[in-house]
C-alpha cells in the first residue's frame, strides 16, 4: 500500500472500517453463531407451551397449575436480561454469552428429570436466567460487527432464529412427544446449547468496539479485526470509536437515562412490553385454546408452530425495509397489522385452512415487529451503554411476557372463549403501534 494512505489508518475508526468493507466470511461466522444462540433460545422458550397438554395429562394436574411454571422461566428471563447487560458492558459480550448458553442448556436438561410442579418451577426459573441473558448480548455483539448499511437486515435475520426455534419446537414436539413423552423436548433443548457453548468459547470473538471503549489494548483489537481486512488493520497504530468523545457518563445507566436517551428508552420499553403481551399469550395458550375448541393435539401443535414460523418469513423483510425506510414507521405498521390479524383469527374458528393462514399472518406481523425491536435499540444506544440498553428493553419487556401468560390463564379461568381472547389482543397491538411511532418523533434515534 502506498505511503500516502498511512495517516488515514494510523488511528482507525472501528465502525467506519467495518462500514467500508464487504461482509467477510469471519463476520458471516459471527452471524451464524449468534443465529444459533437465538434459535436455541427460541426452542427452549417455547418448550413449556408445547409440552403443557402432555404434561398435565401425565401428572394428572389441571392447566392452571402450570401457570406459575409458565411464568417462572419468564421471571428468570427478566433477571437474566437486566443483570447481563451491565455485566456485558463491564466484562465483555463474549464471556456473558458463553455463560448464558451454558446455563440455559444445563438447567433445561435438568428440567427434563422433574417429578413435580415445584421442581419444574425452580428449574425453569434457572433456565430463564440463561435465556434472558443470551438474546440481548447476541444482538449487541452482532450489531457491533455489522456495517450500518446491513445492520437492521442482519440483526433481524438473526432474530428470526428465535421464531424458527419456537416453530421447530412445535414441529418437533408433534413428532417427539407422542413417541417419547414430554421429557424429550426438554432433553433436546438442553443438550444442543451445551454443545454450542463449547463452540462459542473457541470460535466467537469479543466485540472490537467494546475492546476499544474499555481500553483493552490495540493488540487485542487488531487480533479480532484482522480477519476482516488484514492489510488495513496491520497499518493501524491505534483504534477509536468517535462516540467516546460525545457520550460522557459515570455508568451505563446514566447513559441510557441521559437527556438524549431517556424518552426513547421508556418508549422502547413500552413498545416491546406490549408486543410480548401478545406473543406470550399466544405462545403459551394458543395450543391449549385450540385443544379446547376441538382440535387434535397434532393440529394444535402445528398451528401453534405456524404462529412462530410467520416470524421467520417476515424478519428478513422487516430488516430490509428498516435499512431503507423510516424504521419506526415500518415497525409500527407491523404492530398495527398484528392487531388486525389477531382479531381475524378470533373470527375464524372452525375453518381450519383459513384459521391456519390467519395465524401465520398474525405471526408474521407480531413476530416480525418484535424481531426488529432489538435492532432499533442497538442502533439507538452508544457502545458504552448498548448492551445495557438492549438488555433492559428485553428485560422490562419480559414483564409483558409474564403478563401475557398470566392474562391467558386468567381469561381461560374466567371462561372466555377463543374469539374473546383473540379480540382482546387488539389493545396491546394498538399501544405498541402508538409507542414506536411516538419514539420516532421524540427521540434522537436514527430514522433511516
UniProtKB/Swiss-Prot annotation:
Membrane topology, as annotated: Multi-pass membrane protein
CDD domains (UniProt xref): MFS_PcaK_like (cd17365)
GO molecular function, a single term: transmembrane transporter activity
Record carries keyword Membrane: yes
Pfam families: MFS_1 (PF07690)
Residue intervals on the Periplasmic side: 52-67, 116-119, 174-184, 283-301, 351, 420-421
Record function comment: Transports 4-hydroxybenzoate (4-HBA) and protocatechuate across the membrane. Driven by the proton motive force. Also functions as a chemoreceptor, which is required for chemotaxis to aromatic acids.
Record-stated family: Belongs to the major facilitator superfamily. Aromatic acid:H(+) symporter (AAHS) (TC 2.A.1.15) family.
The protein's name in its UniProt record: 4-hydroxybenzoate transporter PcaK
Gene from which this protein is expressed: pcaK
Amino acid at each position: 500500500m502506498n505511503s500516502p494512505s498511512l495517516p488515514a489508518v494510523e488511528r482507525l475508526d472501528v465502525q467506519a472500517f467495518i462500514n467500508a468493507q464487504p461482509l467477510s466470511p469471519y463476520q458471516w461466522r459471527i452471524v451464524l453463531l449468534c443465529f444459533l444462540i437465538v434459535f436455541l433460545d427460541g426452542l427452549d422458550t417455547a418448550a413449556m407451551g408445547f409440552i403443557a397438554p402432555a404434561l398435565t395429562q401425565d401428572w394428572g394436574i389441571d392447566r392452571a397449575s402450570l401457570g406459575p411454571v409458565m411464568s417462572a422461566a419468564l421471571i428468570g428471563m427478566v433477571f437474566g436480561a437486566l443483570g447481563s447487560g451491565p455485566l456485558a458492558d463491564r466484562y465483555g459480550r463474549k464471556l456473558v454469552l458463553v455463560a448464558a448458553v451454558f446455563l440455559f442448556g444445563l438447567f433445561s436438561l435438568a428440567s427434563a428429570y422433574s417429578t413435580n410442579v415445584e421442581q419444574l418451577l425452580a428449574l425453569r426459573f434457572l433456565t430463564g436466567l440463561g435465556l434472558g441473558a443470551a438474546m440481548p448480548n447476541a444482538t449487541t455483539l452482532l450489531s457491533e460487527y455489522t456495517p450500518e448499511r446491513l445492520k437492521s437486515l442482519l440483526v433481524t435475520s438473526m432474530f428470526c432464529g428465535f421464531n424458527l426455534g419456537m416453530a421447530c419446537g412445535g414441529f418437533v414436539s408433534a413428532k417427539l412427544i407422542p413417541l417419547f413423552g414430554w421429557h424429550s423436548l426438554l432433553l433436546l433443548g438442553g443438550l444442543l446449547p451445551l454443545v454450542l457453548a463449547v463452540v462459542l468459547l473457541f470460535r466467537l470473538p469479543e466485540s472490537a468496539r467494546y475492546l476499544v471503549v474499555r481500553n483493552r489494548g490495540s493488540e487485542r483489537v487488531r487480533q479480532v479485526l484482522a480477519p476482516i481486512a488484514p492489510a488495513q488493520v496491520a497499518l493501524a497504530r491505534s483504534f477509536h470509536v468517535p462516540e467516546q468523545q460525545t457520550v460522557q457518563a459515570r455508568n451505563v445507566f446514566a447513559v441510557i437515562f441521559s437527556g438524549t436517551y431517556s424518552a426513547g428508552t421508556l418508549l422502547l420499553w413500552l413498545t416491546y412490553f406490549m408486543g410480548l403481551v401478545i406473543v406470550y399469550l399466544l405462545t403459551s395458550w394458543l395450543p391449549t385454546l385450540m385443544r379446547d375448541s376441538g382440535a387434535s393435539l397434532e393440529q394444535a401443535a402445528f398451528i401453534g408452530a405456524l404462529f412462530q414460523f410467520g416470524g421467520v418469513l417476515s424478519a428478513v423483510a422487516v430488516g430490509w425495509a428498516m435499512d431503507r425506510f423510516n424504521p419506526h414507521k415500518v415497525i409500527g405498521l407491523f404492530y398495527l397489522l398484528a392487531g388486525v390479524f389477531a382479531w381475524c383469527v378470533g373470527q375464524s374458528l372452525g375453518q381450519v385452512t383459513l384459521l391456519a393462514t390467519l395465524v401465520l399472518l398474525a405471526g408474521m406481523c407480531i413476530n416480525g415487529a418484535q424481531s426488529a425491536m432489538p435492532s432499533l435499540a442497538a442502533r439507538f444506544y452508544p457502545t458504552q451503554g448498548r448492551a445495557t440498553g438492549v438488555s433492559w428493553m428485553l428485560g422490562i419487556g419480559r414483564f409483558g411476557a409474564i403478563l401475557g401468560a398470566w392474562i391467558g390463564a386468567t381469561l381461560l379461568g374466567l371462561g372466555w372463549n377463543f374469539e374473546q381472547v383473540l379480540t382482546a389482543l387488539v389493545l396491546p397491538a394498538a399501544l405498541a403501534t402508538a409507542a414506536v411511532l411516538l419514539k420516532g418523533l421524540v427521540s434522537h434515534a436514527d430514522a433511516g
